[in-house]
């Protein structure tokens, strides 16, 4: 699994973190000051990269969490069939099928950018 461990205090809005075994993009990050009996706490709110579900995480700032290493890749649309597109990776020349997001209109020979993590892929931009 391409991921690494970081302390919660090292996270920032816009970066990625694993929540409930799913990679999520951090939308909001806040900390509460340490009290008389305990350390500072951080609250992280994020949205699933591939499933769009909202998730939250509350941990001490010195706790360790997993951070996924999500790759941003380039591809070319080979063919379009309904809601699916046949895409060829421009680095490895591997072809695979991807779901076309609503509102997007792809044609053959379009270059696209997509995110990939553990076999899951999503078109961005």
Curated annotation (Swiss-Prot):
Q: What does UniProt give as GO cellular component?
A: cytoplasm
InterPro entries reported for this sequence: IF5A-like, IF5A-like_N, NA-bd_OB-fold, Rib_uL2_dom2, Trans_elong_IF5A_hypusine_site, Transl_elong_IF5A_arc, Transl_elong_IF5A_C, Translation_prot_SH3-like_sf
Positions where Hypusine occurs in the chain: 36
User: Which keywords fit this entry according to its UniProt record?
Assistant: Cytoplasm, Hypusine, Initiation factor, Protein biosynthesis
Q: Where in the cell is it found?
A: Cytoplasm
Q: Which GO terms describe its biological process?
A: positive regulation of translational elongation; positive regulation of translational termination
Entry-linked Pfam families: IF5A-like_N (PF21485)
Annotated GO MF terms: ribosome binding; RNA binding; translation elongation factor activity; translation initiation factor activity
Q: Which PROSITE patterns match?
A: IF5A_HYPUSINE (PS00302)
Q: What is its main location?
A: cytoplasm
Transmembrane intervals: none
SMART domains found in the cross-reference section: eIF-5a (SM01376)
The similarity annotation says: Belongs to the eIF-5A family.
What is the annotated role of this protein in its UniProt record? Functions by promoting the formation of the first peptide bond.
In its UniProt entry, what is this protein called? Answer: Translation initiation factor 5A
